[in-house]
Regions:
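Short, charged recognition helix plus adjacent turn
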Residues: 10, 14-15, 23, 34, ...
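Short acidic alpha-helix initiation/capping motifs at coil-to-helix transition points
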Residues: 1, 40-44
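Recognition helix of helix-turn-helix/homeodomain-like DNA-binding domains
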Residues: 27-41
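Residues that mark the N-terminal boundary/hinge immediately upstream of a DNA-recognition element
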Residues: 17, 43-46
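DNA major-groove recognition helix of helix-turn-helix/homeodomain DNA-binding modules
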Residues: 45-60
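A short, Lys/Arg-rich alpha-helix, primarily the initiator
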Residues: 1-17
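Residues within the helices of the helix-turn-helix
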Residues: 8, 19, 30, 48
Length: 71
């Protein structure tokens, strides 16, 4: 499961919109929202793309996508 709150905060902090990030990683906004809300899982390639687009560190990436305290 994804730490949705942390991912949304990182997107907001970046100054980008969720719809923009969705397009940058090759998803529709609706598909991206489903994944953010844990209705569907992110593919590894999508995690890599989000990490690149948002400029996440490996620790941030791991906390968002692989941490035990996901929300």
């Amino acid at each position: 499961m994804v730490n949705s709150n942390m991912l949304k905060k990182k997107i907001d902090d970046s100054g980008m919109k969720i719809k923009y990030v969705a397009v940058q990683i090759g998803l529709t906004p609706a598909g991206f929202y489903k994944k953010i809300n844990n209705e569907s899982e992110f593919k590894v390639s999508e995690v890599v793309a989000i990490t690149r687009v948002l400029g996440l560190s490996s620790n941030e990436r791991d906390e968002i996508f692989f941490g035990s305290g996901v929300a």
